């Protein structure tokens, strides 16, 4: 383990506990001399991520076992009506993942914490199991426990290099005090992690972002009791705990500072950076709005320290593709003490058994890609992620900083059509269109309409109708594309794909990539372009994830296989609807008839003389094609299709409408609807599994992904994660959500007990009220129901 903070100590402890006695924890200075030494030490279980919530719950159990945790409870205030709605939504999501929290009134909050004013207080979430600890005491206690189990802890050992074998796996660590052979290396080096990983030729992404907190003196007559609950006030951007009658106060600045984006000085240690009082003043003012007497409190010390932030504010936990034996527990993004205990346990499980009880996929270290090698761009994303750590971010809001980064060859045409651009993995891509209006970039748009029906709802309905009733067209160039070539390509894909891949050249296969236990690692299409050449197509945000996962599956005995991302090599135009064939037939002499161009095939055709690889697939449940074209010719291909489609009222659509279209047909979205903890039969995807290959996956399941119709025809603000109840008992949580414009229903997916079949009734907790819902067939829309 490299790094003597709470996470490194936790990994060392859990490996030693698992029986790995030859475990060594290395620290370049003294224990807790990195970000750990400046942490405030607050720990809450409240988090919308099932995995992080479980990390935090276990961390508290571990700290209690070590005798270092003060369980005083925690209050999260709502200082605005919108924040109260967010807390209501958060409480429902917490219940949906098994955390029992209580939403209480302003008066009840004041009874638990008499020091506050209830002015502008709309309520709070109360979590009695929350609390705080002393960072130094906790880390040293965990390191001592690791030593007791046989681990070694070596301070004043700075790592200077990582040796690899001829096959690229880890071999040894070089330090300024000598060499240590190791078959497994865990980088838990905080803000130095990217530099340490680079020693092994690995690329990871995190940026040091300044975080400030202060110790405030007790105010005479307003001394705070030592057992006062911890508090968090997102509207005022602050958190705190009592200490010596005063308070340790921290917060999240609206314009945070990123530093050392090209590399952190090795000699930086536990000393604070020069603090910035001017940047901290708004946080003091925010605290005084909830604790008026804090305006009189003197500052004992203001501390400024950089924390490692990733572009999505999620940690980096797991193996590093391409370097067997190298693991990460870094980029914790202010989840150090909350996540440290659980991260250490899960990573130790992964190292010793090859599996983790929890779904670590959201934290995979390889999810970022070449676009993030631009350190300034990565830093802007990290700064924005930090900004929204407390500041209310609505579900439909888009990133704003660091844009534009990547644009497709069709970007100017999208602008001319009035696109409202969102951002995904650096790509600018249309969310929806406003014909006749100037294009713009979406940002914090939902702040203007809150948790209500979006003002562009009717526009989405029109785009939806185009795909269902006429023909719609969309720029899908941001698709992730991976070329898999060589004599080892087919054996690799057959080993990891649920479906049968060995089909004729020109076949397109819809499949999931599966872990050995049947857990779903990806949801993709694979096109066979030649006997030893396959193209995998995935979502824009998953291309690096899928590429890295495939590299992790490669075995020493595999024949030569080359994996290469090709996302920028081709533009993609999607066109679907009842008249899609009519449009395509007008611009090509090739046979695109039902018999001449069957479903799930790929043909080379000419569109107005331009060479195009056409794939007859659909993600919207209508006839159509994905058209892969050289970016240099993409604009002309688009223009010809638009001209040919004019008589059918062809309409451009954005990515927002895809959820509505796909959910009416029962199509899934990876990450939201299924992941490593679900198998294809639970996800309703058993049709895509070759049972001869995967006989080990149990067909009989206890839960199943179901479609729900929630409420009546009127729009219901559901966003995913809300608790689903059956006779007052929580039985699941919502996954994907969308309004189905053809069927006029609020649709959502949820894993439910198999006893709840179509026709069954449940309830969904939506902003504090229970809304009736009906279990529907997977596809609520059949072809016969499509309105012409």
Where are these regions (language model features)?
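Flavin-dependent oxidoreductases
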Residues: 10, 42-44, 162-275, 282-294, ...
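Glycine-rich FAD pyrophosphate-binding loop
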Residues: 16-36
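Dinucleotide-binding Rossmann-like beta1-alpha1 core, especially the glycine-rich loop
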Residues: 40-112, 235-240, 246, 278, ...
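Glycine-rich phosphate/pyrophosphate-binding beta-alpha loops
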Residues: 42, 48, 130-135, 237, ...
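Flavin (FAD/FMN) cofactor-binding and adjacent substrate-gating region
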Residues: 65-66, 70, 79-149, 154-155, ...
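C-terminal catalytic lobe of FAD-dependent flavoproteins
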Residues: 235, 271-406
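Conserved, structured C-terminal
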Residues: 395-423, 429, 441, 455, ...
């Amino acid at each position: 383990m490299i790094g003597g903070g709470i996470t490194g100590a936790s990994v060392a402890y859990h490996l030693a506990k698992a029986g790995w006695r030859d475990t060594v924890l290395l620290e370049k200075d003294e224990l807790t001399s990195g970000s750990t030494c400046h942490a405030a030490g607050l720990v809450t279980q409240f988090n919308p991520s099932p995995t992080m919530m479980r990390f935090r719950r276990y961390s508290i159990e571990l700290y209690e076992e070590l005798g270092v945790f003060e369980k005083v409870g925690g209050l999260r205030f709502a200082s605005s009506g919108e924040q109260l709605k967010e807390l209501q939504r958060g409480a429902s999501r917490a219940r949906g993942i098994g955390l029992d929290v209580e939403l209480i009134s302003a008066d009840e909050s004041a009874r638990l914490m008499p020091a506050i004013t209830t002015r502008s207080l709309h309520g709070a979430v109360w979590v009695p199991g929350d609390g705080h600890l002393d960072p130094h005491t906790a880390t040293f206690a965990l390191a001592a426990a690791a030593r007791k189990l046989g681990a070694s802890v070596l301070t004043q050992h700075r790592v200077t290099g990582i040796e690899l074998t001829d096959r690229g796996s880890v071999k040894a660590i070089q330090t300024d005090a000598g060499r240590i052979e190791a078959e497994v290396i865990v980088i838990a080096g905080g803000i130095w992690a990217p530099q340490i990983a680079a020693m092994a030729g690995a690329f990871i992404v995190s940026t040091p972002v300044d975080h400030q907190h202060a110790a405030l003196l007790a105010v005479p007559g307003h001394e705070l009791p030592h057992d006062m609950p911890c508090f968090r006030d997102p509207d005022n951007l602050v958190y705190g705990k009592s200490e010596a009658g005063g308070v340790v106060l921290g917060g999240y600045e609206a314009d945070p500072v990123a530093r050392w984006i090209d590399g952190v000085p090795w000699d930086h240690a536990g000393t604070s950076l020069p603090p910035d009082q001017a940047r901290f003043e708004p946080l003091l003012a925010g605290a005084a709005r909830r604790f008026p007497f804090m305006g009189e409190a003197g500052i004992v010390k203001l501390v400024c320290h950089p924390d490692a932030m990733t572009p999505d504010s999620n940690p980096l936990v797991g193996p590093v593709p391409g370097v067997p034996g190298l693991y990460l527990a870094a980029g914790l993004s202010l989840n150090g003490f909350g996540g440290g205990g659980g991260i250490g346990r899960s990573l130790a499980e992964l190292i010793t058994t090859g599996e983790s009880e929890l779904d670590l996929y959201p934290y995979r270290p390889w999810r970022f890609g070449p676009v993030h090698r631009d350190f300034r761009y990565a830093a802007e994303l990290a700064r924005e992620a930090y900004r929204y750590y407390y500041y209310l971010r609505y579900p439909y809001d888009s990133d704003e900083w660091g844009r534009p980064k990547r644009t497709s060859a069709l970007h100017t045409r999208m602008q001319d059509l009035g696109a409202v651009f969102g951002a995904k993995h650096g790509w600018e891509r249309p969310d929806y269109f406003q014909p006749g209006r100037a294009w713009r970039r979406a940002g914090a748009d939902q702040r203007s309409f809150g948790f209500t029906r979006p003002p562009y709802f009717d526009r989405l309905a029109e785009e939806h109708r185009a795909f269902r009733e006429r023909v719609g067209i969309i720029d899908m160039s941001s698709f992730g594309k991976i070329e898999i070539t060589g004599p080892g390509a087919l054996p690799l894909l057959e080993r990891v794909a649920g479906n049968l891949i060995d089909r004729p050249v020109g076949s397109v296969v819809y499949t999931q990539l599966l872990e050995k236990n049947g857990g779903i690692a990806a949801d993709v299409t694979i096109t066979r372009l030649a006997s030893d050449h396959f193209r995998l197509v995935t979502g824009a945000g998953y291309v690096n994830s899928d590429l890295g996962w495939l590299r992790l599956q490669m075995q020493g005995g595999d024949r030569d296989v080359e994996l290469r991302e090709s996302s920028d090599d081709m533009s993609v135009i999607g066109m679907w609807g009842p008249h899609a064939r009519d449009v395509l037939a007008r611009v090509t002499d090739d046979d695109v008839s039902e018999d001449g161009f069957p479903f799930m095939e790929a043909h080379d055709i000419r569109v107005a003389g331009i060479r195009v690889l056409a794939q007859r697939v659909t993600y919207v449940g209508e006839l159509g094609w994905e058209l892969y074209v050289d970016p240099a010719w993409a604009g002309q291909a688009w223009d010809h299709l638009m001209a040919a489609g004019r008589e059918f009222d062809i309409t451009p659509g954005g990515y927002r409408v895809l959820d509505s279209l796909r959910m009416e047909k029962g199509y899934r979205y990876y990450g939201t609807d299924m992941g490593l903890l679900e198998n294809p039969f639970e996800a309703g995807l058993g049709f895509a599994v070759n049972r001869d290959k995967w006989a080990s996956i149990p067909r009989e399941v206890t839960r199943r992904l179901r479609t729900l119709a929630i409420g009546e025809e009127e729009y219901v603000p559901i966003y995913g994660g809300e608790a689903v109840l059956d006779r007052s008992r929580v039985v699941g949580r919502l996954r994907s959500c969308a309004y189905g414009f053809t069927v006029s229903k609020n649709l959502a997916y949820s894993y439910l007990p198999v006893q709840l079949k179509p026709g069954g009734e449940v309830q969904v907790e939506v902003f504090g009220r229970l809304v009736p819902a009906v279990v529907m067939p997977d596809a609520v829309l059949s072809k016969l129901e499509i309105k012409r």
